[in-house]
Amino acid sequence: MENSFKAALKAGRPQIGLWLGLSSSYSAELLAGAGFDWLLIDGEHTPNNVQTVLTQLQAIAPYPSQPVVRPSWNDPVQIKQLLDVGTQTLLVPMVQNADEAREAVRATRYPPAGIRGVGSALARASRWNRIPDYLQKANDQMCVLVQIETREAMKNLPQILDVEGVDGVFIGPADLSADMGYAGNPQHPEVQAAIEQAIVQIREAGKAPGILIANEQLAKRYLELGALFVAVGVDTTLLARAAEALAARFGAQATAVKPGVY
């Protein structure tokens, strides 16, 4: 049950990922064999639920790619369910301050360190109590990544970085650029300056900086600055643009798409 993704971040080994938005175990398994270090199963902006997350975790399990799951909110009940079906690494959205980061960590820990409910006899995570001493080992294998996506969160970053149990901080460029007044333009110089400063600050604090960006030049720039978990594409975008390009080569008139974060 060792969390190899958490171990890689702790060792300072950059992890390259892909975002999964199709909410399909079939496509998740297809992409699990593509060679990415991690795959993000998105529960915030897709029609995923606990059941569909479970089937994607099962589909990815035989492959080297490590799953990361984003719940729809920093909700301890939802987090408990996601952990019980086998999630070990969580990306918690819209964390604004240290108290919210602390709540996210507590939701992943069994008492007395946290508030995770004990239901291991019902849980895939413990292999239905077939993993020896699961309740004693589980806390140490949980990896908590929190998202900062607003100016308020950026202001509170030093305090968030001080929270014990936060393994990494993920910068959300789409929401951050919108909050800064540049919606749809994460490449604006002010947004980029904030992102770069945050990456350096997170790494200097001994935490893992992360981000999603489909621009390869920017992705490489963030890695150079010290980012440790970088998603470089989204399955929905890859499929849509490839299909449009193929159709266009045979004369189809595709709808113009403005380049964005993904």
UniProtKB/Swiss-Prot annotation:
The keyword Secreted does not apply. It is an enzyme of class 4 (lyase). Homohexamer; trimer of dimers. Belongs to the HpcH/HpaI aldolase family. GO terms for cellular component: cytoplasm. A divalent metal cation binds at residues 149, 175. It comes from Shigella sonnei (strain Ss046). It catalyses: 4-hydroxy-2-oxoheptanedioate = succinate semialdehyde + pyruvate. GO terms for molecular function: 4-hydroxy-2-ketopimelate aldolase activity; metal ion binding. The keyword Lyase applies. PANTHER family: 2-KETO-3-DEOXY-L-RHAMNONATE ALDOLASE, PHOSPHOENOLPYRUVATE CARBOXYLASE FAMILY PROTEIN. Keywords: Aromatic hydrocarbons catabolism, Lyase, Metal-binding. The active site is at 45 (proton acceptor). Its EC number is 4.1.2.52. The record marks 70 as: Transition state stabilizer. Catalyzes the reversible retro-aldol cleavage of 4-hydroxy-2-ketoheptane-1,7-dioate (HKHD) to pyruvate and succinic semialdehyde. One of its GO terms (biological process) is 4-hydroxyphenylacetate catabolic process. Pathway: Aromatic compound metabolism; 4-hydroxyphenylacetate degradation; pyruvate and succinate semialdehyde from 4-hydroxyphenylacetate: step 7/7. This is 4-hydroxy-2-oxo-heptane-1,7-dioate aldolase. Substrate binds at residues 147, 174-175. The record marks 84 as: Increases basicity of active site His. Binds 1 divalent metal cation per subunit. InterPro entries: Aldolase/citrate-lyase_domain, HKHD_aldolase_ent, HpaI, HpcH-HpaI_aldolase, Pyrv/PenolPyrv_kinase-like_dom, Pyrv_kinase-like_dom_sf. Its cofactor is a divalent metal cation.
